[in-house]
Swiss-Prot record:
GO terms for biological process: mRNA catabolic process; RNA processing. Belongs to the polyribonucleotide nucleotidyltransferase family. It catalyses: RNA(n+1) + phosphate = RNA(n) + a ribonucleoside 5'-diphosphate. It holds the Pfam family PNPase. The keyword Phosphoprotein does not apply. PANTHER family: POLYRIBONUCLEOTIDE NUCLEOTIDYLTRANSFERASE, POLYRIBONUCLEOTIDE NUCLEOTIDYLTRANSFERASE 1, MITOCHONDRIAL. Coiled coil: none annotated. Gene3D superfamilies: GHMP Kinase, N-terminal domain, K Homology domain, type 1, Nucleic acid-binding proteins. Involved in mRNA degradation. Catalyzes the phosphorolysis of single-stranded polyribonucleotides processively in the 3'- to 5'-direction. This is Polyribonucleotide nucleotidyltransferase.
Length: 720
């Protein structure tokens, strides 16, 4: 019934199995990949005919996690998986980025890759396995895919690289790096690091590249057994058309790409394009060429002019050389009511970054496949259409915004203080107000400044820079701080963020078949020079975190109470803690280990809440003086609330120094009194005294009397 084929290898000390022919047989390509006990299914379907009216590769990649894979039922009312989580979106991008450059030029057929997590063993993260499975399914599908690719996760512990560390091992690693590529070159890198050197980062990339070679060989072996015949892609020869078009507009297009200002340059390019349209599509005549073909040739000419100009002259579009960073202006404290804010401008790229400090109530609850946890650091990136001078629809967050936000998050996360030292929930929002390349790295710089402006004690300021590449044969140029056009027309987007000590995040995307170790080494060294320069410019605005939190930020005090007292502080159905919150206005969070966090903008309210909680969580001491409130007056005395929720009896004989006929002659309900704890009777009832305390000063009269007696004793002995 089934025409099954499989390949199994040992990879990083665990078995990796790739199987096809049993599940999803109607897809063009389908592979079930198993690593340990983590299992994913990758499917590929490509449309039979090209999509009309498009000049790009219509590729869609969807990664989805099913909760049954971890033996769980989804939360919520409907009890089924909903819209993609952040993790699913990020892994979808992780798969897309290395496979997209490997499709044949001119492939315009709708192509969909779906990867589904079927089982998760809580040891092996499914993301790398999903990349491997997608690569295998594409290789089998018959789509014009010039793969396969391999992928690996690399950790760094005890000065050694670790291949595919488990989820438990990732807790202790100094590096989390995912690398993907072909047998010959690296195509994609995504990483977070604890301020590691360029050499260690490059070593990790090459370590991963070496160790995913067996995976590529396994996919090739499976393809030899089960792959479909590759589909043909028709590609017209446009060399003559390109030569003709260059003669028509070279005089306009070449000077256009020497204009430094983005909008003026775009206007000049648009004028050249209009000339092309007018020439090839004259009114009233049947056009000789398709509009998409003309547009593709025009784009190719743009790239050719920009690329060869850089290689031949060393000068870029805006007149800079390869290593120069655009002019930078960094400002902090730009928003009066925000807890922290910064405006970071680099050339025509600008980010308004705002920090807000919150309490435990503001933590984000993450329901991940590997388990639930609370996130205390959030970084959100917004890219409105006005930032590039366009109109557009505002709606749900796009994949690109999620990806750029996570990249900036990875850059900042390693330099944040530990949560037990700075117990705030931190939210950073980067609003891109202008964009001409490298907006995610502007977000990193702005986030660092904004956090320091808010008083968050970062280990060190952090900056980011985007590097580009022009590669023609054996000639290449690595570009620092790339423009948007250099990104679109170049071969690489290589983003590096870090401190003066080392790298905290690295992301690389290649649009060609891959780059060599030599080019990466040059790019990392050049990126360090640029990063140090940017840090120097940022230091003109702020060098360290402010000594005090922002005026409008909440203050948080942290202390511990015995775990057996948590129930008393919370009260039945939360009655006690609700009363504390209502009466003091403070926010209170109590952890299972007895850690209490009290937050408030009002110092007095915070003190009152802390005093109240401590009074409940601790026991009163015999002989100590307390201030209390009379809650009930009886014939035999008065009950006084004196220690949190604790009440005690002041017997009528202890109300005053002189004889008291009626308790109500001395006190009434609601009176504020000072009492001394005398002790506890046989039944555990609390005994208090008012007469032992000076009600005006709070002085212990019994102790004062004892001191006076001791002072009089020598005089009596002398017979005075």
């Amino acid at each position: 019934m089934f025409n099954k084929h499989s390949v199994e290898i040992d990879w990083g000390g665990r078995p990796l199995k790739l199987e096809t022919g049993k599940i999803a047989r109607q897809a063009d390509g389908a592979v079930v990949a198993t690593y340990g006990e983590t299992v994913v299914l990758a499917t590929v379907v490509a449309a039979k005919t090209p999509r009309e009216g498009v000049d790009f590769l219509p590729l869609t990649v969807d990664y989805q996690e099913k909760t049954y894979a971890a033996g769980r039922i989804p939360g919520g009312y409907f009890k089924r998986e909903g819209r993609p989580s952040e993790k699913e979106t990020l892994v979808s991008r992780l798969i897309d980025r290395p496979v997209r450059p490997l499709f044949a030029d001119g492939w315009r057929n709708e192509t969909q890759v779906i990867v589904t997590v079927l089982s998760h063993d809580m040891e092996n993260d499914p993301d790398v396995l999903a990349m491997v499975a997608a690569s295998a399914a594409l290789t089998l599908s018959g789509a014009p895919f010039r793969g396969p690719i391999g992928a690996a996760r690399v950790g760094f512990m005890n000065d050694e690289y670790v291949l595919n560390p488990t989820l438990d091992e990732m807790v202790d690693t100094q590096l989390e790096l995912v690398v993907a590529g072909t047998a010959d070159a690296v195509l994609m890198v995504e990483s977070e690091a604890k301020e590691l050197s360029e050499d260690i980062m490059l070593g990790a990339v090459m370590f991963g590249h070496r160790h995913f070679q067996p995976v590529i060989n396994a996919i090739i072996e499976l393809a030899e057994k089960a792959a479909k015949e590759p589909r043909e892609v028709s590609q017209a020869d446009d060399s003559a058309l390109e030569k003709e078009m260059l003669g028509l507009i070279e005089g306009e297009l070449r000077p256009a790409y020497a204009i430094a200002d983005k909008q003026q340059r775009q206007n000049a390019v648009a004028a050249a394009k209009a000339k092309v349209i007018a020439h090839y599509f004259p009114e009233g005549q049947e056009p000789k060429y398709d509009k998409l073909r003309i547009a593709a040739v025009f784009k190719h000419l743009e790239a050719k002019i920009v690329r060869w100009n850089i290689l031949d002259t060393g000068k870029r579009i805006d007149g800079r050389d390869a290593k120069t960073v655009r002019n930078i202006l960094a400002e902090v404290g730009v928003l009066p009511r925000a807890h922290g804010s910064a405006l970071f401008t680099r050339g025509e790229t600008q980010a308004m970054v705002v920090t807000t400090l919150g309490t435990g109530e503001d933590e984000q609850y993450i329901d991940a496949l590997s388990g639930t946890y609370k996130e205390t650091f959030l970084l959100h990136y917004n890219f409105p259409p006005y930032s590039v001078g366009e109109t557009g629809r505002l709606g749900s967050t796009k994949r690109r915004e999620i990806g750029h936000g996570k990249l900036a998050w990875r850059a900042i996360h390693p330099v944040l203080p530990p949560h037990h030292e700075f117990p705030y929930t931190i939210r950073v929002v980067s609003e891109i107000t202008e964009s001409n390349g490298s907006s995610s790295m502007a977000s990193v710089c702005g986030a660092s400044l904004s956090l320091m402006d808010a008083g968050v004690p970062l280990k060190r300021p952090t900056a980011g820079i985007a590097m580009g590449l022009i590669l023609e044969g054996s000639r290449y140029a690595v570009l620092s701080d790339i423009l948007g056009d250099e990104d679109h027309l170049g071969d690489m987007d290589f983003k590096v963020a870090g401190t003066e000590v080392g790298i905290s995040s690295l992301q690389m995307d290649i649009k060609i078949a891959g780059i060599t170790e030599e080019i990466m080494k040059v790019a990392l060294a050049q990126a360090r020079e640029g990063r140090i320069h940017i840090l120097g410019e940022m230091a003109k605005a702020l060098t360290n975190a402010r000594a005090e939190l922002g005026e409008y930020a909440p203050r948080i005090e942290t202390f511990k109470i015995p775990t057996d007292k948590i129930r008393e502080v919370i009260g039945t159905g939360g009655k006690v803690i609700r009363e504390i919150v209502e009466k003091t206005g403070a926010k209170i969070n109590i952890e299972d280990d007895g850690t209490v966090k009290v937050a408030s903008n009002d110092g007095e309210a915070m003190k009152a809440a802390i005093k109240w909680i401590k009074s409940i969580a601790s026991d009163p001491e015999v002989g100590q003086i307390y201030e209390g409130t009379v809650v009930k007056v009886m014939e035999f005395g008065a009950f006084v609330n004196f220690f949190g929720a604790k009440d005690g009896l002041v017997h009528i004989s202890q109300l005053a120094a002189n004889r008291v006929q009626k308790s109500s002659d001395i006190v009434k309900e609601g009176d504020k009194v000072k009492v001394k704890l005398l002790g506890f009777d046989d039944r555990g009832k609390t005994r208090l005294s008012m007469k032992a305390v000076d009600q005006q000063t709070g002085e212990d009269l019994e102790a004062a009397g004892h001191k006076a007696e001791k002072a009089d004793a020598p005089r009596e002995a002398a017979g005075e």
